[in-house]
Structures are given as structure tokens and as C-alpha cells.
């Protein structure tokens, strides 16, 4: 809505199974139609790349550039702790994670916390997410020697992507838009707050008392 005349391309990589050689293009299944003619989405199998990206992803990006797309998003098939292949072909990189990363010491092993332009903690409504956000911020400060930077100024954003008009997602877009020169409206509301009839801490109440 902030850039109605811009053309956006989504290139989504899905993993290929070694045993069968096939790939379930799940993003294509969920997005079988797009409501805007300025949006294009293509699923790509990783095939034999041995990586979280396809061996042909860089060529797909060049084709998208050649036909005039203004912004190209590339989604990996999932990333390991020591992987950062996407940073070699993308101008800007986002690392999206949840609070289920295990012990805080596991953060030491995640390469993308060193190199990603933006780090996103999604599903922030889940229990333990606030502790996870503090741990991620501490790790980013250590990795990048940013001890003098306030927590709110770090390239770490908390989101609830499943929530309509989530302020965290709007704040993430604002940060990304600043980097790539796009327009972005001001986020409205408090980041990380789940809207709904049932408070987050009571969502699993019936299961807990059963």
C-alpha cells in the first residue's frame, strides 16, 4: 500500500528430498493466486545444490531484474546454524527465527546473527519470547561490538506475523524500507502485543487443567 506502483517478485526455495528427488513446493500451494498484478511469485526446488538456496537462484534474480522488478524477495528453504549462503547473492538479508532455539548458548553458533542486516523474532506471542528477545539482543551486541547501542536501536525486531496489521511487521517493513529506499508508513500500536479475545497466557488453559 505504501508503494502501489512498484513491482515485487517473490522467489521461494523449497528443499529437494534426496531419496525421491522431488520437492513439495509448499509456498506455491498456499499462494495459488495473487490479488495484485504487480506481484509475481515463483517456487524453486533446491535440487542438488546441497544448500538452503537453489543453484539457479542467482540466475532467477538476474531474470527478475531484467524484466523490471523493483524489489526481489528470496526465501531460503531453511538455514542451519553455520549457513549464510543467501548473503552472497542478496543485497540485504533477513534472518527469521522463533524462541525455540534451545539454550542461550546455541545463539553463539548462529552465523546469521553476525551477518544479517535484520534479525526477526517471529511468533512473539509464544511463551518465553520476551526472554528470547533479550538473549538475542545480548548476543547481537557481543557479536557486533554494539554494547553502546540501545536495545531498541539494534537490528532486531519482534513480530507476530499471523496477526492482521501487526505493529511488529509494520516496524520491520519500516526498517527494511529505509535500507532499500521504499516508502513506509509509521507503525501504529505496540510491538509484540497479541490482539484477541483470549489473553496469550490463557490460550492453553484448558489443556493445562485437563
For the regions a protein language model found, what residue spans apply to each?
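Extended helical scaffolds that flank P-loop GTPase cores
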Residues: 182-210
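Catalytic cores of large soluble enzymes that bind and process phosphate-bearing ligands
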Residues: 45, 49-56, 78, 108, ...
Amino acid at each position: 500500500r505504501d508503494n502501489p506502483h512498484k513491482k515485487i517478485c517473490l522467489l521461494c526455495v523449497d528443499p529437494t528430498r534426496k531419496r525421491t528427488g522431488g520437492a513439495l513446493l509448499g509456498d506455491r500451494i498456499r499462494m495459488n493466486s495473487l490479488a495484485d498484478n504487480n506481484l509475481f511469485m515463483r517456487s524453486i526446488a533446491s535440487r542438488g545444490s546441497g544448500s538452503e538456496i537453489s543453484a539457479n537462484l542467482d540466475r532467477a534474480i538476474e531474470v527478475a531484474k531484467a524484466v523490471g522488478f523493483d524489489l526481489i524477495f528470496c526465501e531460503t528453504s531453511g538455514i542451519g546454524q553455520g549457513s549464510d549462503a543467501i548473503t552472497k547473492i542478496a543485497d540485504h538479508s533477513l534472518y527469521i527465527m522463533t524462541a525455540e532455539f534451545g539454550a542461550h548458548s546455541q545463539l553463539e553458533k548462529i552465523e546469521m546473527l553476525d551477518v544479517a542486516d535484520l534479525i526477526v523474532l517471529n511468533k512473539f506471542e509464544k511463551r518465553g519470547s520476551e526472554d528470547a528477545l533479550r538473549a538475542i539482543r545480548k548476543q547481537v551486541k557481543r557479536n557486533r561490538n554494539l554494547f553502546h547501542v540501545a536495545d531498541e536501536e539494534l537490528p532486531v525486531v519482534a513480530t507476530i506475523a499471523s496477526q492482521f496489521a501487526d505493529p511488529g511487521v509494520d516496524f520491520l517493513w519500516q526498517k527494511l524500507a529505509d535500507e532499500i529506499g521504499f516508502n513506509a508508513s509509521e507503525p501504529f500500536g505496540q510491538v509484540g502485543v497479541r490482539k484477541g479475545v483470549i489473553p496469550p497466557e490463557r490460550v492453553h488453559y484448558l489443556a493445562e487443567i485437563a
